[in-house]
């Protein structure tokens, strides 16, 4: 709503006044200069609100009356004095604590940063089939944010529920890291002997970040080495707390965000110490999160399984202390994961003798969390051919969540009930699945297939949002701003902004490239900037009022992924629908994305396969590669009759382009060409009509079918079966893999009665196939002529003989087999026959 107007200069000045600029040199010892720890007493909700408005670095508080510990400089203490809140100083100067003999501040009995790092290496080396070190990022001082993956196939990305545990985001809260170490070690040691732990490693992918803030642990400081509270630096509803001058200022925050955004975690747990409480979203506002019922249910699973007599479970804002920029709000608000922070001990640094005690208090809770996180709904989102599609999903009245863009799988924890699921993906028709039944003991699996729709493309995720000083008069429905325009909107706040992830790449083509929709009937002013990365640099496209289209020509960029929409006033800052009301961002030109299908993937050697492109983004060129195929390449959109003659497994790739940029999809071992059974009945033959011919179709087949209708491996063929003249005999053999091969032989029966069984001993016939000739020698008789027959008994040649003792005969005809009959001159009595070549 519009009530007044503020110039852009005033906006910039007000933002600068909010930010606290701190040099990293001030944090050489882990804390700001002269920073002290104080205990603040809170007696009422009014005092809690006054404390929150001071934006001090405070630990959580979950009872009123109660107390919290804050970390303040002398300047901040002066502001606290003016507020009228009561406090006592517990540590006058946090930078003057005594170092250990090894030069660190980590209490004896707890692992140092180097020891944590070495532990991860040692565990991965000892259990390479269960553990893999994964890279999340490094700290300001170049320490690794030590992270391990636990799974029965740690080197593979499997379609299994993913669990995220993070420890030590506040470096001086050291117990959680010890818990993570012990959980990882016990899972490995008991794999194969403990049924639950074995199943969790077989059916889950569990990631444990043992040190989010290694510099802070090394210095026993809440902050990173630049003095930023990483748990106030998150981008979802960031508000300038924790010395954070802008969202994701800390290098550790960026690394954490990028890694978590690259996965699709079902549950994200952020471990702390300093009290005992399981705190779930929202922490930035009092209103319940859309998934409140589901998150609370899973939180109670942890609490009930834990060793605590009564682990409190509740919303962060009301159950503990209001904060902005927390990782739990970020992981839930942007990614839709069940997310919370979990405080495991009253003391931040309990005596080392209690490390095992607190691990045992949490172990069963962690195991049951991993176990139950697989309930609700699971499944995949693909196109009709099974190609993975990056999709956004939303159960009605809950936060959107996302599938794995590579493996296509998703997981959403839900309490038992009947649900409706909305599924959207750029370049595909949207789908609504109703009446999904979820029970208490098993996940409901959904195999979701979407049909291409080139015109359907919308921005899909809110990655950063900022409403100055919050605005609890508005519902803060960030989820309303993603997906298709539907007149439901997120009001970004007066002088607030939002960064939208298009999920796809928007490309610069002639005309407008994307369109911003306002969701109400009161057009308001805003500015738009774009970037190829989530952190900028940002290129301004200009200002607009209400729904408007934008062209990337104004940015000097050919492609972008992120869009920053900033309200530029006027209007009230603390009213319903304050600021620009963002309904949706439509993507008018998206980068081509390759996808394809075939009419079959498993074939028998020699079969043909037909391929078709299912690519989105209106591609104009196609480049196919068919390993082992004939032909091996094609530039058609839908190549047909690609033959795979040899058995084996073959890759297929498709590269598409729509004029700007290209995309390739290679599917490994996409075509499986099965071996044909070996069948060889031998050469065609001529035999006497009284003889039988044994035939063998080869051992080891699944079935046989002969032309005689017999189904055995062997046959004995004679003139009674085939007839006096003979003929073809065929067999079809089906291999164990289902492939069929066949062979045919011609058997000719001749009546040699009166001709003899062969040439007499004194007649010798030598055949020379390469010259198609015969050498005939004899003694004692004069030969008159040579008759040449084929196997069907037809006379091919009649060759006069010279009657001498030997002769060289050149045949005119070539046949596979020729029956030769020699005739004696005196009475033309046949003296024998011989079958040659």
Predicted regions located by residue number:
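Proline- and Ser/Thr-rich low-complexity, intrinsically disordered segments
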Residues: 591-618, 630-638, 643-645, 649-766
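Short, acidic Ser/Thr/Gly-rich low-complexity loop/linker segments typical of extracellular
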Residues: 389-415
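A short, solvent-exposed beta-strand micro-motif common in secreted/extracellular proteins
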Residues: 416-427
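A short, amphipathic beta-strand motif
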Residues: 376-384, 448, 695
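Structured interaction patches on ligand/partner-binding surfaces of diverse proteins
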Residues: 427-453, 749
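Active-site/substrate-binding loop(s) of hydrolase catalytic cores
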Residues: 157-292, 296-300, 304, 308, ...
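C-terminal outer-membrane/trafficking sorting elements
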Residues: 9, 22-28, 621-623, 649, ...
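A domain-level signal for the mature, folded cores of soluble proteins
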Residues: 104, 108, 132, 454-590
């Amino acid at each position: 709503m519009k009530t007044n107007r503020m110039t852009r200069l005033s906006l910039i000045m007000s933002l600068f006044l909010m930010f606290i600029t701190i040099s990293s040199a001030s944090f050489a010892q882990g804390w700001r200069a002269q920073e002290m720890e104080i205990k603040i007493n809170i007696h009422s909700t009014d005092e809690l609100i006054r404390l929150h408005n001071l934006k001090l670095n405070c630990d959580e508080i979950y009872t009123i009356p109660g107390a919290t510990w804050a970390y303040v400089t002398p300047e901040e203490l002066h502001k606290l004095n003016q507020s009228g809140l009561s406090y006592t100083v517990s540590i006058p100067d946090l930078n003057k604590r005594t170092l250990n003999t090894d030069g660190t501040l980590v209490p004896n009995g707890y692992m140092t940063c180097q020891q944590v790092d070495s532990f991860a290496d040692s565990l991965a080396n000892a259990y390479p089939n269960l553990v893999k070190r994964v890279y999340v990022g490094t700290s300001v001082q170049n320490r690794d944010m030590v992270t391990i993956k636990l799974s029965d196939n740690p080197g593979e990305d499997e379609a299994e529920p993913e669990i995220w545990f993070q420890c030590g985001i506040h470096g001086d809260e050291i117990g959680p890291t010890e818990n993570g170490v012990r959980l990882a070690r016990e899972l490995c040691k008991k794999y194969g002997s403990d049924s639950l732990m074995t199943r969790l490693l077989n059916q889950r992918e569990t990631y444990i970040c043992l040190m989010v803030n290694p510099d802070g642990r090394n210095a026993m400081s809440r902050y990173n080495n630049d003095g930023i509270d990483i748990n106030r630096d998150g981008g979802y509803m960031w508000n300038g707390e924790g010395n954070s001058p802008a969202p994701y200022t800390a290098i550790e925050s960026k690394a954490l965000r990028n890694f978590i955004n690259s996965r699709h975690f079902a549950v994200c747990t952020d471990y702390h110490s300093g009290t005992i409480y399981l705190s779930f979203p929202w922490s930035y506002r009092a209103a319940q999160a859309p998934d409140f019922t589901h998150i609370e249910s899973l939180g109670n699973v942890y609490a009930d399984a834990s060793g605590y007599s009564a682990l409190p479970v509740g919303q962060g804002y009301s159950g503990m202390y209001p904060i902005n920029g927390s990782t739990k709000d970020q992981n839930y608000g942007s990614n839709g994961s069940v997310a919370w922070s979990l405080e495991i001990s009253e003391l931040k640094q309990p005596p080392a003798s209690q490390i095992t005690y607190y691990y045992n208090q949490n172990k069963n809770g962690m195991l049951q969390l991993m176990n139950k996180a697989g309930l609700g709904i699971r499944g995949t989102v693909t196109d009709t051919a099974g190609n993975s599609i990056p999709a956004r999903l939303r159960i009605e009245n809950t936060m959107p969540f996302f599938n794995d863009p590579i493996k296509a799988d998703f997981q959403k924890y839900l309490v038992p009930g009947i649900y409706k699921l909305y599924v959207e993906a750029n370049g595909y028709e949207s789908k609504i699945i109703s009446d999904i039944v979820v029970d208490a003991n098993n996940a409901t699996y959904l195999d979701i297939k979407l049909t291409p729709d080139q015109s359907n493309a919308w921005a899909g995720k809110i990655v950063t949002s900022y409403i100055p000083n919050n605005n609890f008069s508005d519902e803060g429905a960030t989820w309303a701003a993603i997906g298709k325009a539907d007149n439901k909107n997120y009001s970004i706040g007066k002088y607030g902004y939002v960064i939208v992830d298009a999920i796809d790449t928007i490309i610069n083509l002639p005309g407008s490239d994307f369109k911003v929709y306002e969701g109400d009937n009161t057009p308001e002013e805003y500015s738009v900037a774009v970037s190829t990365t989530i952190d900028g640099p940002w290129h301004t496209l200009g200002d607009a009022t209400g729904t408007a289209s934008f062209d990337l020509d104004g940015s000097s960029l050919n492609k972008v992924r992120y869009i920053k929409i900033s309200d530029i006033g006027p209007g009230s800052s603390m009213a319903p629908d304050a600021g620009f009301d963002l309904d949706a961002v439509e993507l008018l030109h998206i980068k081509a994305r390759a996808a394809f299908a075939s009419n079959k993937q498993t074939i028998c050697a020699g079969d043909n396969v037909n391929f078709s492109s299912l690519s989105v983004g209106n591609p104009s060129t196609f480049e196919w590669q068919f390993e082992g195929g004939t032909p091996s390449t094609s530039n058609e959109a839908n190549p047909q009759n690609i033959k795979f003659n040899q058995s084996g497994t073959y890759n297929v790739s498709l590269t598409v382009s729509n004029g700007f940029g290209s995309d390739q999809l290679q599917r490994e071992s996409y075509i499986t060409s099965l071996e044909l059974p070996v069948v060889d009945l031998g050469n065609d033959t001529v035999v006497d009509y009284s003889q039988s011919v044994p035939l063998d179709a080869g051992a080891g087949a699944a079935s046989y079918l002969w032309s005689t209708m017999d189904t055995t491996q062997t046959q004995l063929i004679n003139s009674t079966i085939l007839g006096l003249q003979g003929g073809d005999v065929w067999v079809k053999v089906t291999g164990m893999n289902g492939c069929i091969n066949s062979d045919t032989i011609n058997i000719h029966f001749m009546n040699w009665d009166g001709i003899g069984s062969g040439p007499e001993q004194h007649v010798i016939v030598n055949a020379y196939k390469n010259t198609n000739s015969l050498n005939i020698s004899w003694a004692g008789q004069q030969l008159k002529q040579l008759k040449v027959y084929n196997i069907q008994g037809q006379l091919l040649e009649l060759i006069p003989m010279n009657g001498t003792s030997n002769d060289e005969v050149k045949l005119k005809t070539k046949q596979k087999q020729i029956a030769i009959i020699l005739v004696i001159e005196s009475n033309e009595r046949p003296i024998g026959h011989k079958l040659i070549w």
